[in-house]
Amino acid sequence: DIDIQDKFHGTYGPIIARRFKKDDWNNDQRAFYESCLLHGYDECLDHNNPYSSGIGPMPVNNFEGIRYSTAIGYLSLARNRDNLTISSESLVHKLLIDGKRATGVLFEKDKELIKAEADEIILCAGAIASPHLLMLSGIGNPNNINQYGIPVIHELPGVGQNLRDHPQVSVVWKLKPEARVDPLSSPLQIGLRFTSSSSSLRNDMYTLGSSALPIEGTYHISNSPRDNFGLVSHLNLEISSGQVYLGSS
């Protein structure tokens, strides 16, 4: 974090975090900020502080026009290591299991099935693909796995359960010509973190102001001033949960 240095913020990691200064805010973002203050919301200078709430600048991971992804922050520094092979455009089919131990993965690249084995296997395919791969490999709820003729290697009913998402709804307005903003400016600068009136969970809601939400339903790149502004409300701490099930083998 190049803006704040305290016990909640790192200072030496490969992913840059920063916030837009008030002088750099778009007019629509500034109007959203000032309206929230007028309606009684607190000012929030640091959304990454776990105790904060209110309206303020969003932490972003772009710097000097470059978004610092994990590919840039981590892989670009490590891709030339002798003990690292990066396989792009590859589809993992399943884990390779020997007894009760994962020994590798079976993946497809250029229509060829390839086995890759190692002493340690780390599965980090996200909240949906990780349980999906486990079930394809025979790890999970037998009632679901057996439907598709996959041998059950390890019965683990919790695989794919308690799936939580952050549903959102957007409301978009057409801006008057004098309120339109530079198309090359950042469309997301300000966020509101708050507790909904009927919730027992603190800060269960996030509302972001965005000038990049398309009114016509499609995203595109244009040199014309942005002519819309939207509020995107996220349910950030949901109570309900869902499941991931296999649909085929």
Regions found by a protein language model. Give the residues of each.
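Conserved redox-cofactor binding core of oxidoreductases
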Residues: 1-102, 108, 170-174, 182-183
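FAD cofactor-binding and catalytic pocket of flavoenzymes
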Residues: 169-249
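Glycine-rich loop(s) and the adjacent beta-strand/alpha-helix scaffold that form part
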Residues: 94-95, 100-183, 246
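General small-molecule cofactor/ligand-binding pocket signal
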Residues: 44, 85-87, 151-155, 208
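Flexible glycine/proline-enriched surface loops and loop-helix/loop-strand junctions
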Residues: 12-18, 126-128, 176-177, 225-229
